[in-house]
Amino acid sequence: MKLPIYLDYSATTPVDPRVAQKMAECLLVDGNFGNPASRSHVFGWKAEEAVENGRRQVAELINADPREIVWTSGATESDNLALKGVAHFYQTKGKHIITSKIEHKAVLDTARQLEREGFEVTYLEPGEDGIVTPAMVEAALRDDTILVSLMHVNNEVGSINDIAAIGELTRSRGVLFHVDAAQSAGKVEIDVQKLKVDLMSFSAHKVYGPKGIGALYVSRKPRVRLEAIIHGGGHERGMRSGTLPTHQIVGMGEAFAIAKQEMAAENVRIKALSDRFFKQVSDLEELYVNGSQTARVPHNLNLSFNYVEGESLLMSLKDIAVSSGSACTSASLEPSYVLRALGRNDELAHSSIRFSFGRFTTEEEVDYAAQEVCKAVNKLRELSPLWDMYKDGVDISKIEWAAH
């Protein structure tokens, strides 16, 4: 076993060697390096063929028509294109958008920008299990609502929203529905024919593909119109200009093809690893599982260790790569906005760690990590006066701390 151990697969995944191999074939002078938009010679034709093959592979994972896949630089851009593209195109119809408080920053920050432009956004508060229900969405719908944007799987706590039920509701009301599927692709079965979804964002680097490439599914039936946010050449049917990076597209296609073949078996293996890890840490007192106990992906286990500061626990686990909060916000000292929205108090939010397991995680690594977590938590609690008070039966929440 090699140290350090990587248990932060929800932040990013390493590229699968099979994917890297395919990508390498599109880089050098004797490879498929042409510009897919070059229509006048074989180098361009071959590159275009590779791009269209990748498009088909992504479409097949989600049961879409390849013509419904638009290449982007990643899920952040896909989210931006979906929200801004719909808002700007349909603004004469209405200016109200619905999302939730626990979305990824790529959706929340885009929604804030649209508010500055005069759109009105309702931010739904999920249940403490991290799930947004169809009833919550229905209660927020108005005559001028043009878009609902919700994630499929939450990146911090792994809870799974009932996209099918929400899609039935939005479709029956004639409201467009965008889903951020960055954390669900390759983990949860997605069939856009069954899910009444109009737009769906994907990223390659969460599915053992390269960083810097993603896709947006844009439904053709019923047809969704978007206003582009990047101009210059009219690539991707005018929705997203810019020379297509053949090597990255080939990588994303291969990664999604592997996910389609191996997802079922991989989910069983990862659930076993996650259960194995949890069993070994579950004897710790004051341990809380964040998010839904039932509707969750096994890849993500977000735990709060009460009376332990999350940052100090991270420092103690120097040979284990995990995160507190999501990778995009964990540089700030604020407690996780997701956990706060689930009703966790500041202490529990600050004491949370996200463990995420993946394709290359082994039983040996999981056992070592669990053992180190138990050691670190017990050691940090020994140093904590609050832990002593808790053990003595003092209700810490009732203490009035004196200000200096």
Curated annotation (Swiss-Prot):
Protein name from the UniProt record: Cysteine desulfurase IscS
Lineage of the organism: Bacteria, Pseudomonadati, Pseudomonadota, Gammaproteobacteria, Pseudomonadales
Role: Master enzyme that delivers sulfur to a number of partners involved in Fe-S cluster assembly, tRNA modification or cofactor biosynthesis. Catalyzes the removal of elemental sulfur atoms from cysteine to produce alanine. Functions as a sulfur delivery protein for Fe-S cluster synthesis onto IscU, an Fe-S scaffold assembly protein, as well as other S acceptor proteins.
Cofactors required: pyridoxal 5'-phosphate
Entry keyword Transferase: yes
Example of a GO MF term: pyridoxal phosphate binding
Annotated InterPro entries: Aminotrans_V_dom, Aminotrans_V_PyrdxlP_BS, Cys_deSase_IscS, Cysteine_dSase, PyrdxlP-dep_Trfase, PyrdxlP-dep_Trfase_major, PyrdxlP-dep_Trfase_small
The species this protein was found in: Pseudomonas entomophila (strain L48)
GO CC, one annotated term: L-cysteine desulfurase complex
Annotated gene: iscS
Chief place of localization: cytoplasm
Cross-referenced PANTHER family: CYSTEINE DESULFURASE (PTHR11601:SF34), CYSTEINE DESULFURYLASE FAMILY MEMBER (PTHR11601)
Family statement drawn from the similarity comment of this UniProt entry: Belongs to the class-V pyridoxal-phosphate-dependent aminotransferase family. NifS/IscS subfamily.
Subunit architecture: Homodimer. Forms a heterotetramer with IscU, interacts with other sulfur acceptors.
Record PTM N6-(pyridoxal phosphate)lysine, positions in chain: K206
Keywords: 2Fe-2S, Cytoplasm, Iron, Iron-sulfur, Metal-binding, Pyridoxal phosphate, Transferase
GO BP annotations, alphabetical order: [2Fe-2S] cluster assembly
SUPFAM superfamilies associated with the record: PLP-dependent transferases
Record-annotated disulphide pairs: none
Reaction catalysed by this enzyme: (sulfur carrier)-H + L-cysteine = (sulfur carrier)-SH + L-alanine
EC number: 2.8.1.7
Pathway given in the UniProt record: Cofactor biosynthesis; iron-sulfur cluster biosynthesis
First-level EC class: transferase
